[in-house]
Regions:
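Bacterial N-terminal signal peptides
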Residues: 1-8
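Compact beta-sheet-dominated domain cores in extracellular/mature segments
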Residues: 11-122
Length: 122
C-alpha cells in the first residue's frame, strides 16, 4: 500500500504545474522541472492555431492531468484535441506551450515575443 502511495506522489510531482516568479514578469506557470509555460494570443480558448514551424519553436505542453499549487484551481486546467491529432494542456481554455529558446528552468526568453507570446499567468 505504501509503495502505491509513493508512486502516486511521484506521479503527481512529475505532472505538477508550479508557480514561478521573476522581476519584470511577475508570477507565471512552469512545469515540474521549472520550465516556463506560455500562452499564444492568436489562439482562442479551446483552439490552437500554432502549427508546423510554429510548433518547432513553441513545443506543446501536454499532461492529461496536472497537480496544481495551492491557491490555483485544478478545474482551470484541461486538455484539447488539436487538428494534428495531438492533445494539449490548457489553462482557462488557452493552450499552453514551451519556448525552444528557453534553455534553463526559470528562463522567460519567449515573454512578449512578437507581442503575441506571453508567460502563462495565474
Amino acid at each position: 500500500v505504501l509503495s502505491l502511495a509513493l508512486a502516486g506522489v511521484a506521479l503527481a510531482a512529475h505532472h505538477a504545474v508550479k508557480l514561478s516568479e521573476k522581476d519584470g514578469v511577475g508570477k507565471f506557470f512552469a512545469d515540474s522541472k521549472g520550465m516556463t509555460l506560455y500562452i499564444f494570443k492568436k489562439d482562442s480558448p479551446g483552439k490552437s492555431v500554432c502549427a508546423g514551424p510554429c510548433v518547432e519553436k513553441w513545443p506543446l505542453y501536454f499532461r492529461e492531468k496536472v497537480a496544481v499549487p495551492e491557491g490555483v484551481s485544478a478545474g482551470d486546467f484541461g486538455t484539447i484535441p488539436r487538428e494534428d491529432g495531438k492533445r494539449q494542456t490548457t489553462y482557462k481554455g488557452w493552450p499552453m506551450y514551451y519556448y525552444a529558446g528557453d534553455k534553463a528552468p526559470g528562463d522567460v526568453s519567449g515573454q512578449g515575443l512578437g507581442t503575441v507570446w506571453f508567460v502563462a499567468n495565474p
